[in-house]
Regions:
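Extended mid-to-C-terminal alpha-helical interaction segments
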Residues: 200-297, 302
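N-terminal low-complexity or simple alpha-helical regulatory segments
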Residues: 1-99, 120
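Short acidic, hydrophobic short linear motifs in intrinsically disordered regions
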Residues: 36-44, 146-148, 278-280
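Short, Lys/Arg-enriched C-terminal cap helix and immediately downstream tail that follows
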Residues: 304-309
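Short, hydrophobic/amphipathic alpha-helical patches that form generic packing surfaces
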Residues: 24-32, 130-138, 269
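Conserved phosphate/pyrophosphate-binding and hydrolysis machinery centered on Walker-type P-loop NTPases
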Residues: 48, 125, 154, 187, ...
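Short helix-coil junctions and helix-kink-helix linkers
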Residues: 47-49, 152-155, 285-290
Length: 309
């Protein structure tokens, strides 16, 4: 099961304390997943989802917060995907639309064209959070953080995009928007933003999983950076050692080695014998011991002498 499905499966278990909060969540779910159709003489409001638990949640919200009895219809495509439609018909559909603030009177259905959010229903932060939860259940998704940080809401209309954007910014979120195949996509790529949304929606178990993955990724990235840094330092040390050995061998080849002062010859002999040792390790082998900078100074002096020939 996907990380996104796990998130929705946790959200549908949340128990709200008031009808107003339930209405706010239902408003989000219906606005972003609902469609009005007239089929023969029947008017049907369908809220569509691929998740059966989300369909059950919407059914329960309609029953408990609005007092209507809807039905769940399962539609299967040519493949293995099934769609669950929570259907409210005729008077129940009108009651639902009025209860959620999409229309004010039954006759408004004759002119209804698209959903828009009545912000008067979202006058408190707790209602906005519930609305955000409902919107996510209908049109949201979040990627497994092990792969990448990405959460998005695929919004069906430009007007709803504005509504969702407004609610999000009022909750101090900073969404970004892109148009993908004619659909407005409100998205987040920051791990901090995604964690904030999970918190606002009430997905606390998923939030813990998200943070655990983030911590592991950060530890792994830190380890990789450290390893890369150590490898780079090792390459520098090896490169320097090669140059030093070449300078010493040049002096030996030209019979100039014995002209070096004894302190330089001592370091040169150690470098030839211990080519993979660090400057610090070479210095500890000298009598008396010499610090890293002192060894480096002597080897540079040898290189300068070799460069003259």
């Amino acid at each position: 099961m996907s990380f996104s499905s796990d998130t929705k499966n946790e959200l549908v278990k949340i128990k709200d304390h008031s009808a107003a909060v339930c209405l706010a969540e239902l408003m989000g779910a219906v606005a972003f997943g609902g469609k009005i159709r007239r089929e023969g003489g029947t008017m049907v409001l369908r809220t569509v989802t691929e998740n059966p638990k989300v369909a059950r949640r919407i059914y329960q919200l309609m029953r408990d917060a609005v007092g209507i009895t809807s039905k769940i219809v399962i539609k299967k495509t040519s493949g293995t995907t099934a769609y669950y439609q929570v259907c409210a018909e005729n008077e129940d559909a009108i009651t639902l639309m009025i209860s959620l603030g999409f229309i004010t009177k039954p006759s408004d259905m004759n002119y209804f064209s698209s959903f828009s959010v009545n912000t008067a229903y979202l006058d408190k932060p707790v209602k906005k959070k519930a609305f955000l939860r409902g919107a996510f259940l209908s049109c949201g998704s979040v990627m497994n953080p092990e792969k990448k940080y990405h959460m998005e809401f695929a919004v069906p209309t430009y007007g709803l995009h504005n509504d969702l954007f407004s609610v999000m910014t009022s909750l101090s979120l900073k969404p970004k928007v892109v148009v993908r195949k004619g659909t407005m996509v409100v998205y987040f790529k920051s791990s901090e933003d995604i964690a904030d949304i999970l918190t606002l929606m009430g997905a606390y178990n998923i939030l813990m999983r998200f943070h655990n993955v983030k911590i592991i990724k950060e530890i792994r990235n830190d380890a990789n950076r450290t390893a890369n840094c150590e490898m780079a330092n090792l390459r520098k040390m090896v490169d320097a050692s090669v140059v030093q050995v070449q300078a010493i061998e040049k002096l030996i080849r030209l019979n100039k080695f014995n002209t070096l002062p004894e302190n330089l010859k001592e370091v040169a002999r150690l470098r030839l014998e211990y080519r993979e040792h660090t400057l610090k390790e070479l210095g500890e082998m000298l009598t008396p011991p010499l610090g890293k900078s002192g060894v480096n100074h002597r080897l540079r002096k040898i290189q300068e002498i070799a460069d003259k020939y």
